[in-house]
C-alpha cells in the first residue's frame, strides 16, 4: 500500500490503495444461509476461526448495513426472487460469495425441478467456494480471495 516514505516523515501512496485497503479491512457480511453450508459459515464466525481477524467480524441482519452476501446452500426457485430483492437492497459496492456445491451449481439436487442451478443465474458472484459442505477454512480462503480482488479494483476512473 505504501509506495514511498520520504525523509521528512511523509508517506506517499495512491488514493485507490488507501480506499481499497479500508474496504478489505471492513467487510460487513450478511448471512443468506439456506442449507447445511450455513452451519459451516457460522462455524467460521465462531471463536476457533474468528473471521474478525480478516475484517469480516460482525454478520449483519439487514442488507442495507452489509456489503458482502454469502449465499450458503441450495437455492430453490421460490427463494430466488427473495435473493435478488435482498441483493438489490445492498449498498454499493457489494460483493457475493457463493458457498458450497449447491449454491455454485445445484450440487446434489442439480437435476431437481425446484432448484436453481447456481446462484450466479440470479446475482453476480465474485468468489466461488467449492465443497459439500465447504469447510470453515475454505470460506476464510474465499474471503481472502475476495479481499485480493478488492485490492485490484480502481476507485478512481482511469482516463
Curated annotation (Swiss-Prot):
Annotated localization: Cell inner membrane
GO cellular component: plasma membrane; respiratory chain complex I
Pfam families documented for this protein: Oxidored_q6
Protein's UniProt keywords contain Translocase: yes
Source organism superkingdom: Bacteria
Main subcellular location: membrane
Cofactor: [4Fe-4S] cluster
InterPro entries: NADH_UbQ_OxRdtase-like_20kDa, NADH_UQ_OxRdtase_20Kd_su
CC cofactor note: Binds 1 [4Fe-4S] cluster.
Disulfide cysteine pairs (residue numbers): none
Chain residues that bind [4Fe-4S] cluster: 36-37, 102, 132
Catalytic activity reported: a quinone + NADH + 5 H(+)(in) = a quinol + NAD(+) + 4 H(+)(out)
Family, similarity comment: Belongs to the complex I 20 kDa subunit family.
Subunit (UniProt): NDH-1 is composed of 14 different subunits. Subunits NuoB, C, D, E, F, and G constitute the peripheral sector of the complex.
Protein's recorded name: NADH-quinone oxidoreductase subunit B
Protein's organism: Acidovorax ebreus (strain TPSY) (Diaphorobacter sp. (strain TPSY))
Gene that specifies this protein: nuoB
